[in-house]
Swiss-Prot record:
Protein keywords: Electron transport, Endoplasmic reticulum, Heme, Iron, Membrane, Metal-binding, Microsome, Transmembrane, Transmembrane helix, Transport
The name this protein goes by in its record: Cytochrome b5
Entry keyword NAD: no
InterPro entries linked: Cyt_B5-like_heme/steroid-bd, Cyt_B5-like_heme/steroid_sf, Cyt_B5_heme-BS, Cytochrome_b5
Record's subcellular location: Endoplasmic reticulum membrane; Microsome membrane
Function: Membrane bound hemoprotein which function as an electron carrier for several membrane bound oxygenases.
Protein's membrane topology: Single-pass membrane protein
Residues that coordinate or bind heme: 41, 65
GO molecular function, one term: heme binding
Main localization category: endoplasmic reticulum
Cytochrome b5 heme-binding domain boundaries: 6-82
Family from the record: Belongs to the cytochrome b5 family.
Matching Pfam families: Cyt-b5
Amino acid sequence: MSNDNKKVYTLEEVAKHNSKDDCWLIIGGKVYNVSKFLEDHPGGDDVLLSSTGKDATDDFEDVGHSTTARAMMDEYYVGDIDTSTIPARTKYVPPKQPHYNQDKTPEFIIKILQFLVPLAILGLAVAIRIYTKSESA
């Protein structure tokens, strides 16, 4: 396979080849005409057709193709892709977390109240029990 005389295609040009009779894929920066392979593809032709018009590298790698499958690709190679025509992937940026209050005083007070209020209720209940027991005796 000689890359010297192979054409460089734009994404728009490759995207036009998206039918069962004319199917091109972009994998690893290279363009492949897989039209003749559609019927023989173990995953069916729909899998290949759904990957047209975009960079199908991730789709190809996610399946985990064998070395034999990778070697077969050479016979379908028609050229390279102009990488400047492929839209850049947007990276996931997690939402910024709100800054937490460095002054922990309100949280500290809440924790104390969570401990003291039930303790006060328990103390009040014990006091009422003792008072009512001593009244009846």
